[in-house]
From Swiss-Prot:
It comes from Xenopus laevis (African clawed frog). This is Bifunctional arginine demethylase and lysyl-hydroxylase JMJD6-A. Transmembrane segments: none annotated. The gene is jmjd6-a. It is an enzyme of class 1 (oxidoreductase). Its EC number is 1.14.11.-.
């Protein structure tokens, strides 16, 4: 590695993680040597469905409406990214393009040129390495060519936040790339949105928990995690072993996934999830608001992003009056039963617009879910402040990946 690469890497690390004072802090736990990344240790227990045999209607009925995670296979077989997203080709095509790999203490993006980041990836021994988690590539004249390398899987093409306007809508799509031990800390995606994550190269280890899982049960404390409290690898080192003990509440046992190349994970709104890269991983992920989850997303957007909701409503009334009418029926005083960080700015929907109208069944499903959650709320002990705009029940997708 040349001197300039070392300098740029050092600058990025200092900006993104100022609490880690030197190289010893970055490698203090020696996870590079002592933490097992063996895929065979993952207790993969989430249902898989084949894209070739799963219709959109079946997906909605079997997984989206009941808020059930699933892994979809073969949805990315025709993507050019399968050939184009190798380290060698990315380094050649985007070598001088800057990608976000963290945030500083003031919330500003920390970016690194692709050529320097790949140099870093290939040699790092850091406990929790910097991770490219870039949401702005689609608006950049050169980086937006990444959009040509994949298409949104057919199940996720509702893009209801498109009606909020490109400038006002929250970030919603991310190009993600990182080495072994990098990842995304435990969080819930904001504003009640659901998400999909398609892995092009590498392997990811997931744990998912239902929305009513008590925060204190699955969050690493400061005493336990120190400067690495919010890192995915810290979570798997501290919390995961507890989930396998007989004393762990059975109703909060995690769903586990070993995501392999070509697999797409569907994360319903409100589900806690944590993701660890087991090797060099390259993926794309998007949040989305659909006909099925619209009532919950609308509720949380009004509570957490009132200005956004007003503009969204005005355009929906013109373009999708049936959704505006549904929005009018949502009781904003009742909790949804779906936890999320309403104040987060990294939310939203898939990039591919859909001309299809929502069926009455789709429109009613989200409202039914809210009604069902209200009835179930006393049983599940959902956090009282689950819909507060000031609470911090989760961290945003971006911050949990870059901090």
């Amino acid at each position: 590695m040349n001197h300039k690469s070392k300098k740029r890497i050092k600058e990025a690390k200092r900006s993104a993680r100022p609490e880690l004072k030197d190289s010893q802090d970055w490698c203090r736990h020696n996870y590079c040597e002592v933490f097992s990344l063996n895929p065979s240790t993952v207790r993969d227990n989430v249902e898989r469905a084949d894209d070739a045999h799963l219709s959109i209607e079946e997906f909605i009925d079997r997984y989206e409406k009941p808020y059930k995670p699933v892994v979809i296979v073969n949805a990315t077989a025709d993507w050019p990214a399968q050939e184009k997203w190798t380290l060698e080709r990315l380094k050649r095509k985007y070598r001088n393009q800057k990608f976000k790999c963290g945030e500083d203490n003031d919330g500003y993006s920390v970016k690194m040129k692709m050529k320097y980041y790949i140099d870093y990836m290939e040699g790092t021994r850091d406990d929790s390495p910097l991770y490219i988690f870039d949401s702005s590539y689609g608006e950049h004249p050169k980086r937006k060519k990444l959009l040509e390398d994949y298409e949104v899987p057919k199940y996720f093409r509702d893009d209801l936040f498109q009606f909020a306007g490109e400038k006002r809508r929250p970030p919603y799509r991310w190009f993600v790339m990182g080495p072994a031990r990098s990842g995304t800390g435990i969080h819930i995606d904001p504003l009640g949105t659901s998400a999909w994550n398609s892995l092009v190269h590498g392997h990811k280890r997931w744990c998912l928990f239902p929305t009513n899982t008590p925060r204190e049960l699955i969050k690493v404390t400061r005493d336990e995690g120190g400067n690495q409290q919010d890192e995915a690898i810290t979570w798997f080192n501290v919390i995961y072993p507890r989930t396998q003990l007989p004393s762990w509440p059975p109703e909060f046992k995690p769903l586990e996934i070993l995501q392999k190349p070509g697999e797409t994970v569907f994360v319903p709104g409100g589900w806690w999830h944590v993701v660890l890269n087991l090797d060099t991983a390259i993926a794309v992920t998007q949040n989305f608001a659909s006909c099925s989850n619209f009532p919950v997303v609308w509720h949380k957007t009004v509570r957490g992003r009132p200005k956004l909701s007003r503009k969204w409503y005005r355009i929906l009334k013109q373009e999708r009056p049936e959704l505006a009418a549904l929005a009018d029926t949502v009781d904003l005083q009742e909790a949804t039963g779906i936890a999320s960080d309403s104040s987060s700015d990294s939310s939203s929907s898939s990039s591919s617009s859909s001309s299809e109208s929502c069926s009455e069944d789709d429109l009613s499903s989200g409202a039914e879910m809210m009604s069902h959650r209200k009835k179930k709320r006393k049983i599940c002990s959902v956090m009282e402040n689950g819909d507060s705009t000031t609470q911090d029940d989760c961290v945003s997708k971006e911050r949990s990946s870059s901090r």
